[in-house]
Design a protein with these regions (language model features):
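Extracellular glycan-modifying ectodomains
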Residues: 1-176
Length: 176
């Protein structure tokens, strides 16, 4: 993100500097057919720093992420035909294999909520990107595959018995 990020009450100047260097690198090395931007659901238990220095947490950080993404995409759009956002899947926030082992492989005991911690921030980033580069911004969302729409909770074991998550945040190679 190009937003001034904070995590654990610590300003993340390193993330801001990395984002600036990345935009410069993309701009100088293009043209590209597409630039892919990944995000992870669990990463954004963070906030952003407002221009006045206040720390904005959770959904309150959405305007800062929207503005920062708009700025980032404005910088890179001359170097790419498209910008593709890769959404993260839901995170169980517990170790799935441990849960399955403790419950004799009973996946029903190890389900987790469908919600993603980053929904508001991801939507804000998409708005910012689309405002900067209308018609050239796309999103790939693997969540409906890992957590099918219509299910009240996300499974950890697929109907064919394949374990979906290998820990608290990663899909298994077999499932992926």
């Amino acid at each position: 993100t190009a937003a001034p990020v904070v995590r654990a009450d610590r300003h993340r100047e390193d993330a801001l500097n990395w984002s600036k260097r990345l935009a410069e690198m993309i701009s100088s090395q293009g043209p590209f057919d597409a630039v892919f931007i990944g995000r992870t659901s669990g990463q954004y238990g963070v906030g952003a720093v407002a221009p006045n220095g206040d720390v904005l947490e959770g959904d309150a950080a959405a305007p800062a992420f929207e503005s920062a993404t708009r700025e980032f995409v404005e910088q890179i759009k001359p170097a790419t035909e498209s910008v593709v956002f890769m959404r993260g899947t839901q995170w169980p926030y517990f170790n799935v294999t441990t849960c399955l082992a403790e419950n004799n492989g009973a996946g029903a005991e190890c389900t987790f909520p469908r919600t993603r911690a980053d929904d508001a921030l991801a939507a804000a980033e998409m708005r910012g990107a689309e405002e900067a580069y209308p018609g050239h911004v796309f999103q790939v969302d693997p969540a409906p595959i890992a957590c099918p729409t219509g299910m009240p909770r996300c499974p950890t074991v697929a109907p064919d018995g394949t374990i979906i998550m290998r820990d608290g945040s990663h899909l298994t190679t077999t499932f992926a």
